[in-house]
Amino acid sequence: MFDRIWFKSSFFYLFLLPFSWLYGVISTLNRISYQYGWRKVYRFSVPIIIIGNLTIGGNGKTPMVLWLVEHLKRRGWKVGVISRGYKGKSNNYPIIINMNSHSEECGDEPMLIWKRTGVSVAVSPKRADAVAALLRKQELDIIISDDGLQHYALFRDIEWVIVNSVLRFGNGCWLPAGPMRERINRLHTVQAIIANGSEVGIQSGEVLMQLFPIAVVNILTGERKPLYFLNNVVAIAGIGYPTQFFDTLRSYGIIPIRSISFSDHHVYSEKMLTSLTKKDEILLMTEKDAVKCIDFAHDNWWYVHTEVKINKIDTHNLLSMVENKIRYYKGSRYNVQ
């Protein structure tokens, strides 16, 4: 319902405007309370980069985190990642993800990052606690925060904002009348605006990132096959914008028998998923969904492995920005407050 109000012409947003104004006042007061030193901002001895967004929902933050982690690892830097661990529930924070961790505790996106990259990932609602936990565990050159643009208690050196190149900012209103966590003018203060999707809708000065499916992977066995390997597919997606996943499958020649959408961060059960397919049908999902199903996966369950592609010039510029900050920290005598 909210998507129709936010991203399509609908007068219903007018009824929600008073609540949006209240949200805007609270959001603004929260930000300036840190900017003017009324509340403590936590700083650390390594650079922090935030990869976040201005709107609610999935715009591609986690794929961009994966892209950056993998590039920095290849260049020899020691990288850590922190996350709020949205929808994860635990009695003990911070959590440093390990072989015994479950997505129900730490969240699906942190688990995906850990499984895909192997770097240290810490989860806590208080991101400064997650940073401190990582630095106690090992020496790092940089820490990347998956989301957290509005978490001003954590000092950040670099901010990248991910934008859906098609949906953009909808009607531009604060929550709940619109999708905005902060106003669009916040983009003037970030170091990079990265548009996820197609060149259609991209604005001047923005970096284009595109997600390409590389292979399908069996959740139970880890077997990898080319995209065209699967037939009789039932596709599911519990992400911010499931239709984008289904559209991508069709564009690569995978035409699902059925396409089933779930809410973002949906919690699956074995009984629920087995009921979705008949004999000789394949259940195909996103990698983010797959990390929640590993413990009870069946041999006909597969996920799509995707990778971010960014052109060489923008890749060079983004990595130079980050590496220059790492070198600055290594060359300075930085005092932790």
UniProtKB/Swiss-Prot annotation:
It comes from the Bacteria. ATP binds at T55, I56, G57, G58, N59, G60, K61, T62. The keyword Secreted does not apply. GO terms for molecular function: ATP binding; tetraacyldisaccharide 4'-kinase activity. Its EC number is 2.7.1.130. The keyword Lyase does not apply. Transmembrane segments: none annotated. Keywords: ATP-binding, Kinase, Lipid A biosynthesis, Lipid biosynthesis, Lipid metabolism, Nucleotide-binding, Transferase. It catalyses: a lipid A disaccharide + ATP = a lipid IVA + ADP + H(+). InterPro entries: LpxK, P-loop_NTPase. Pathway: Glycolipid biosynthesis; lipid IV(A) biosynthesis; lipid IV(A) from (3R)-3-hydroxytetradecanoyl-[acyl-carrier-protein] and UDP-N-acetyl-alpha-D-glucosamine: step 6/6. One of its GO terms (cellular component) is plasma membrane. GO terms for biological process: lipid A biosynthetic process; lipopolysaccharide core region biosynthetic process. Belongs to the LpxK family. Transfers the gamma-phosphate of ATP to the 4'-position of a tetraacyldisaccharide 1-phosphate intermediate (termed DS-1-P) to form tetraacyldisaccharide 1,4'-bis-phosphate (lipid IVA). HAMAP family: LpxK. NCBIfam families: lpxK. This is Tetraacyldisaccharide 4'-kinase. It comes from Blochmanniella pennsylvanica (strain BPEN).
